[in-house]
Curated annotation (Swiss-Prot):
Tagged with keyword Ribosomal protein: yes
Keyword terms: Ribonucleoprotein, Ribosomal protein, RNA-binding, rRNA-binding
The organism of origin for this protein: Mycobacterium tuberculosis (strain ATCC 25177 / H37Ra)
Stated name of the protein: Large ribosomal subunit protein uL6
The protein's assembly and partners: Part of the 50S ribosomal subunit.
Task of the protein: This protein binds to the 23S rRNA, and is important in its secondary structure. It is located near the subunit interface in the base of the L7/L12 stalk, and near the tRNA binding site of the peptidyltransferase center.
BP term (GO), one: cytoplasmic translation
Length: 179
């Protein structure tokens, strides 16, 4: 049995879970999220009201999907109750970010400012010209937007300039030695 998959997912008060066949919908104080679980995996509620994810047999594919499905459903419940936030920071002379409406405008050393529009369900917040956060209820969407922003100017291994996650350690390289 999967160590992760066999654990029931507690449903906090104020969260409404609807299970119809392979699709599950979770509604909470921050919004509504849905998921379609892969075919052999079954999702149900137990007597305590918690969500239980089960698999029909110990086939390799089903074992893999068991833990994955349980984690994805757990992420839905966490998303509609607490939400997800990714903190990011910018290093480099003249590199900065500012909020323009609901969009982010970056100055990253290019000849033009780079504007990132906020997709539906994602909010941006700027704490300082070099620190900002990406927030939302969908963990996958928040992570993907943060990765796309980081890709605008990846951290440089020689000088450390660029956009990075807060607390991310950049592996530095030694430059050429002069004669």
């Amino acid at each position: 049995m999967s160590r992760i998959g066999k654990q029931p997912i507690p449903v906090p008060a104020g969260v409404d879970v609807t299970i119809e066949g392979q699709s599950i919908s979770v509604k909470g104080p921050k919004g509504t999220l849905g998921l379609t679980v892969a075919e052999p995996i079954k999702v149900a509620r137990n007597d305590d009201g918690a969500i239980v994810v089960t698999r029909p047999d110990d086939e390799r594919r089903n074992r893999s999907l068991h833990g994955l499905s349980r984690t994805l459903v757990s992420n839905l419940v966490t998303g509609v109750t607490q939400g997800y936030t990714t903190k990011m920071e910018i290093f480099g002379v003249g590199y900065r970010v500012q909020l323009k409406g609901s969009n982010l405008e970056f100055a990253l050393g290019y000849s033009h400012p780079v504007v990132i529009e906020a997709p539906e369900g994602i909010t941006f917040a700027v704490q300082a010209p070099t620190k900002f956060t990406v927030s939302g209820i969908d963990k996958q969407k928040v992570g993907q937007i943060a990765a796309n922003i980081r890709r605008l100017r990846r951290p440089d291994p020689y000088k450390g300039k660029g956009v990075r996650y807060e607390g991310e350690q950049i592996r530095r390289k030694v430059g050429k030695t002069g004669k």
